[in-house]
């Protein structure tokens, strides 16, 4: 996890041209193996931190310690040590074993479960979920960058936010999409339009993939190992995958068209 060179103001949604999202535009994906995790037994159950505000340090290799704050969105049922976290100023959702990853330092609970935010328009929320969309971001010099993607679900805890992924970058992001829709920066693509990679016909959905380990071969021939951790309800062929060497959550359609 690297600190972005410059984080945008909270809530501002901009992308550098061909870059990543707000706050993570300059963030490098670290492809390093996680350190051996501590396996000390616990004499009592851990406190449920889902919905809590947290802070912690982050130490990777010889790099300086950086400080992070965020909200714990969810605990992954198939791997209870893995949590999904929305960090302040970062648009990607991260998956971290907060209690076991040795790079996480001095984990603190800043507050008890935060009050769930409410959406302003439930009907509009239901309209955009599961849809292929075009999402406009402010690029360099005030230009507009168009990103095609799919709205996956309403985010847990932070209910005014939505999970979304993109053709250009198939990892899990979250934004306040209703505001973008009302401002004309989010457009639902017509059903007849060419669908993004995650938009597949519903037939042939594979059951029982949750918890399965997967292997991905990169262009250089090296392999990555990960686990399927979630199935998208509105698009059952689409799954979340957490790779062992990365804290991003990847979104893939695991059912090929015949």
From Swiss-Prot:
- An example Gene Ontology cellular component term from the record? cytosol
Region called Disordered, residue ranges: 1-49
Question: Which residues lie in Basic residues bias regions?
Answer: 28-39
* Compartments in which it is found: Nucleus
Which source organism?
Answer: Homo sapiens (Human)
Functional note: May be involved in the regulation of cell cycle progression. Exhibits H3K4me3-binding activity.
Q: Which UniProt keywords apply?
A: Cell cycle, Nucleus
Q: Where is this site: Histone H3K4me3 and H3R8me2a binding?
A: 169, 176, 180
Region Tudor-like domain 2: which residues?
A: 129-178
Instruction: Describe, as the record does, how this protein assembles with itself and its partners.
Output: Interacts with C11orf84/SPINDOC.
The GO molecular function terms of this record are: histone H3K4me3 reader activity; methylated histone binding
Family statement:
Belongs to the SPIN/STSY family.
Q: Where is this region: Tudor-like domain 1?
A: 50-99
Task: Decide whether keyword Nucleotide-binding is in the record.
Answer: no
Which one GO biological process term can you cite for this protein? regulation of DNA-templated transcription
The protein's superkingdom reads Eukaryota
Low complexity: bias regions: 1-23
Chain intervals for the UniProt region annotation (Tudor-like domain 3)? 210-255
Quote the protein name from its UniProt record. Answer: Spindlin-2A
> Region (Histone H3K4me3 and H3R8me2a binding): which ranges?
138, 246-248
């Amino acid at each position: 996890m690297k600190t972005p060179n410059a984080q945008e103001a909270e809530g501002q949604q901009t992308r550098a041209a061909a870059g990543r999202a707000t706050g993570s535009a300059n963030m490098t994906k670290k492809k390093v193996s996680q350190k051996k995790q501590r396996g000390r037994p616990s004499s009592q159950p851990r406190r449920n931190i889902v919905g809590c505000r947290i802070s912690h340090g982050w130490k990777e290799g010889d790099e300086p310690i950086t400080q992070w704050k965020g909200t714990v969105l969810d605990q992954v049922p198939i791997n209870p040590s893995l949590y999904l976290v929305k960090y302040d100023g970062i648009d990607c959702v991260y998956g971290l074993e907060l209690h076991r990853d040795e790079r996480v330092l001095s984990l603190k609970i800043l507050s008890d479960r935060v009050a769930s935010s409410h959406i302003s328009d439930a009907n509009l929320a239901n309209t955009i979920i599961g849809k292929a969309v075009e999402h406009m971001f402010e690029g360099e010099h005030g230009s507009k960058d168009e990103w095609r993607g799919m709205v996956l679900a309403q985010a847990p805890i932070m209910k005014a936010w939505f999970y979304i992924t993109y053709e250009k970058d198939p990892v899990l992001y979250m934004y306040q999409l209703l505001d973008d829709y009302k401002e004309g920066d989010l457009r639902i693509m017509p059903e007849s339009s060419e669908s993004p990679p995650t938009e597949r016909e519903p037939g042939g959905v594979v059951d029982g993939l949750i918890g399965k380990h997967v292997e991905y071969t990169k262009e250089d021939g090296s392999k990555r190992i990960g686990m399927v951790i979630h199935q998208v309800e509105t698009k059952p062929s689409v799954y979340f995958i957490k790779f062992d060497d990365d804290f991003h959550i990847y979104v893939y359609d695991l059912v090929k068209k015949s």
